């Protein structure tokens, strides 16, 4: 299962104010790679960097480099982002949605972009860390 984790998943997994579900999700992804894998765009990596201490950011980068590489934002087709903007999404949200679609990911895991669920016919799921953990457990049986 290919997942895109929003910046808040990493911030709550590596930062000072941890959420247990986010920490557990990062651990499970690491333990079950490549069955469960991730992709990350530069935009999310930079956002994470703005919210972590240098030490926490080094840990985050180590996690990322063990599992994937950071995709440059310009590789996502501009037209795909425009399609999401035309649906009413703000530019950063449109980019994230376009990135998830472009990668062919199964889900965007986020704690705060659930407004995307109001848009019908998205080619991916939008779930939080807790629901993603449940999904992983149910598909591992």
Q: How would you name each of these model-derived features?
A:
Residues 2, 37, 107-108, 124:
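A residue-level structural signature of the nucleotidyltransferase/glycosyltransferase Rossmann-like core
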Residues 12-13, 47-49, 116-118:
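Short catalytic/ligand-binding loop motif for oxyanion handling, primarily in non-cytosolic enzymes
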Residues 37-72:
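Short, surface-exposed acidic-centric catalytic microdomains
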């Amino acid at each position: 299962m290919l997942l895109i984790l929003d910046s808040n998943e990493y911030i709550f997994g590596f930062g000072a104010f941890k959420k247990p579900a986010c920490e557990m999700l990062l651990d499970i992804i690491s333990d079950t790679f490549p069955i469960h894998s991730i992709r990350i765009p530069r935009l999310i990596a930079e956002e994470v960097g703005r919210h972590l201490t240098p030490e926490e950011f080094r840990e985050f980068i180590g996690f990322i480099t063990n599992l994937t590489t950071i995709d440059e934002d310009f590789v996502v087709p501009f037209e795909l982002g425009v399609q999401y903007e035309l649906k009413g999404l703000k530019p950063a949200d449109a980019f994230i949605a376009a990135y998830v679609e472009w990668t062919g990911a199964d889900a965007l895991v986020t704690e705060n972009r659930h407004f995307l669920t109001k848009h019908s016919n998205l080619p991916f799921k939008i779930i939080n860390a807790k629901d993603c953990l449940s999904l992983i457990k149910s598909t591992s049986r």
